[in-house]
């Protein structure tokens, strides 16, 4: 069993047995019913990417291609415009969060990256002093939240650090997430930020190191318990999924494309499970 599958099953069991019920929940299902959930707090996982440990489950198929395209929308295009995500990348799942027919998700994610010129600043800091301890991407912007409506960022902060081991520089990353739909989005969010970590490492010709993942509120919605039990019954596939970025070292961050990524040795259990999302 891969490390990701072990952690996935452990967290599902913990939420079902030890989780508590949400109160005054904000999300709604499409039928208008309040989307309550059982949740745990303070979930943490560590993956050593350099040793082939990647945060993707084999217990159900994960839409890794569309997930990675979202990273490009946020950190390369640096926009909140849904038309770009729809037309350039063919990704439409964000459309449910459109703000009042504006064609955007509000001043969130990519708009915040552009507003603060975050990517150029991070790359400049790492170039000038890789060992500085201030490499923080934060999408939490109270001014933007007051200015426009929209879903507040779930994965809102990632920090980077480097280590020199036997002459090689490794880039580590720590993702902090305020809220996470365990069954639907956990591995999508994790792999998105692994992809970002890989892009930055490749920009400098470094190796990818460790990926640390902290979720403050990890939950399973009340319409997902049947799927949760099915996932616990499934036997994981014996394989070692790993993401590769097929570009030369020191390829500029902004020249990397979604199709440069390839997920190898990934044979998830089928059929896919269906979920009614909470909006």
From Swiss-Prot:
GO BP annotations, alphabetical order: dTMP biosynthetic process; dTTP biosynthetic process; methylation
EC number of this enzyme: 2.1.1.45
Any GO MF annotation of the entry: thymidylate synthase activity
PROSITE patterns (alphabetical): THYMIDYLATE_SYNTHASE (PS00091)
Classification via Gene3D superfamilies: Thymidylate synthase/dCMP hydroxymethylase domain
Major enzyme class: transferase
Active site: 154
Residues annotated as binding dUMP: 133-134, 178-181, 189, 219-221
One Pfam family hit: Thymidylat_synt
Subcellular location(s) of the protein: Cytoplasm
Key word Transmembrane present: no
NCBIfam families xrefs: PRK01827.1-1
Subunit relationships: Homodimer.
Task of the protein: Catalyzes the reductive methylation of 2'-deoxyuridine-5'-monophosphate (dUMP) to 2'-deoxythymidine-5'-monophosphate (dTMP) while utilizing 5,10-methylenetetrahydrofolate (mTHF) as the methyl donor and reductant in the reaction, yielding dihydrofolate (DHF) as a by-product. This enzymatic reaction provides an intracellular de novo source of dTMP, an essential precursor for DNA biosynthesis.
Protein's name in the database: Thymidylate synthase
Natural source organism: Streptococcus mutans serotype c (strain ATCC 700610 / UA159)
Gene that this sequence comes from: thyA
């Amino acid at each position: 069993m891969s490390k990701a599958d072990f952690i996935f099953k452990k967290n599902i069991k913990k939420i079902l047995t030890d989780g508590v019920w949400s109160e005054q929940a904000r999300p709604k299902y499409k039928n208008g019913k309040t989307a309550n959930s059982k949740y745990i707090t303070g979930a943490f996982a560590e993956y050593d990417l350099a040793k082939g440990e990647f945060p993707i489950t084999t217990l159900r198929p994960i839409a890794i291609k569309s997930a990675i395209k979202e990273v490009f929308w946020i950190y390369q295009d640096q926009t909140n415009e849904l038309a770009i995500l729809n037309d350039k990348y063919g990704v439409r799942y964000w459309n449910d969060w459109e703000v009042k027919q504006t064609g955007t998700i509000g001043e969130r994610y990519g708009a915040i990256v552009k507003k603060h010129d975050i990517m150029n600043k991070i790359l400049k800091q790492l170039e000038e002093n890789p060992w500085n301890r201030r490499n923080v991407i934060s999408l939490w912007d109270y001014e933007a939240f007051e200015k426009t409506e929209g879903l507040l960022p779930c994965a809102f902060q990632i920090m980077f650090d480097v280590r020199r081991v036997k002459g090689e520089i490794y880039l580590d990353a720590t993702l902090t997430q305020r809220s996470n739909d365990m069954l639907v989005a956990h591995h999508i969010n994790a792999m998105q930020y692994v992809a970002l970590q890989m892009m930055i490492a490749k920009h400098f010709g470094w190796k990818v190191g460790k990926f640390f993942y902290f979720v403050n509120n990890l939950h399973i919605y009340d319409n997902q318990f049947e799927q949760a039990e099915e996932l616990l019954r499934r036997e994981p596939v014996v394989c070692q999924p790993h993401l590769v970025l097929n570009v030369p070292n020191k390829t500029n961050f902004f020249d990397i494309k979604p199709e440069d990524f390839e997920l190898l040795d990934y044979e998830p259990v089928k059929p896919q499970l269906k979920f009614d999302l909470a909006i």
